[in-house]
Amino acid sequence: MQKKIDKKEGKINWSEDAKKIIGKINGLFPTPGAFFTFKGERYKILKAVIGNGLGKVGEVISNNLEVACSKNQSIKILEIQRQGKKPQKISEFVLGSNIKKGSIIINV
């Protein structure tokens, strides 16, 4: 019998490398999903790819929501779902989001 996956296991640890984070996003899609929190709100990452940007771990390094992780790697988020909202392509999401370049999204 398989162990049920707890929602907490979906929390993204930005100090992991990009390949591991992408594996979590893909492996936990569609439920329970991989997520991060920002200013008390949960954001579920639905689709992402490995980027090549540099920055501090957990830092948003582009206006199109690319986030730095360990080993000088990054994750480019392509599709996201804000808590209680419908899924959005990142090009739509960034228009009304308060997550901007320079924001830090470290999960505590």
Put a short name on every predicted segment.
Residues 3-16:
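Acyl-group handling in specialized metabolite and lipid biosynthesis
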Residues 15-108:
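An anion-binding loop in the catalytic cleft
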